[in-house]
Amino acid sequence: MNNILNRIYNGYNLTEIESYNLFQYIMSGKINNVQLSAILIALKIKGESEQEIMGAMQACLEQAQPFPKQNYMFSDIVGTGGDLSNSINISTASALVGATCGLKIIKHCNSSISGKSGSYDLLKEFDININISQKKSQEMLNKLNVCFLFAPQYHASFKHVSLVRKILKTRTLFNILGPLLNPSNPPLSVIGVYSTKLMIPIAHILKKLNRHRSIIVYSNNIDEVTLHSPTNITELKNSKITSYTLYPESFGVHFHDKNTILGGTPKENYEIVKKVFQGKGPISITETIAANTAILLQLFGNEDLKKNTQYALKIIYSGKVYQKIIELSKF
């Protein structure tokens, strides 16, 4: 173990097996908090390699509680966070719209670590309880097309790293791992990342996991599709990886200034998202959520992004998403 630690401290990449062994130690609580802080910051400064991400992911998944296998296509839509953008919870909002469109969504959720508002924090403001049993989550999925898997419930070993992550208050390898650790092993996924450097490595990892189709997104330091800048896309489809760029006009919507999608605390984000789903929200945020939902719809074979966006907008303005939120809060 000392040899592995010295390699990290000296700026060398670990092999997949070295990373796996290291994170087995970490997730078993065998590394003290001072060492863990040094490891995470050293990896961050060096830049986490594909092999390091893969090894760490395998170690974390081995200790996770799996979610029952589904016999149909379903998706996650999730971001690494850590992009420092303070945008509203776009992925969570888009998951709710997608489910209202009839898609099956199993979203991996957590409270905020390196930002102001995580998916759990927003859902809590809507009185949606996601800290529920597997059976209850499955019932929610069956009845309402969506369920939310609360990360601490399925990844108990993360208790060994939570304090350090909160103290560091910066993105680390665990931000990268989050979207890869959904206990349901979704065949489809939209994954937002905070850096273009992560796009190809994550696509390679998803390919090794035999994912059916995945779309990885990045836009001007934000881990979502945005309408103020081009959005970089890396797509895994039929075991082939391609990269391309999308623009606001790709979705048939308007350009919007970055400052118009800013959020804040969970309470502030709740007020914004509530207005959107009541049909009274800012057009910039409404169209941004619709564009992200369009990507989600594309995963399920609906290839026309402009039609997808218009359909998502229709669903939002119908009030059906807000009605689904009310149903979820009663579950």
Curated annotation (Swiss-Prot):
The record's remark on the cofactor is: Binds 2 magnesium ions per monomer.
GO cellular component terms, A-Z: cytosol
Q: Which reaction does it catalyse?
A: N-(5-phospho-beta-D-ribosyl)anthranilate + diphosphate = 5-phospho-alpha-D-ribose 1-diphosphate + anthranilate
Which is one GO molecular function term here?
magnesium ion binding
The entry's Mg(2+) 2-binding residues are: 223-224
| Protein EC | 2.4.2.18
Q: What is this protein called?
A: Anthranilate phosphoribosyltransferase
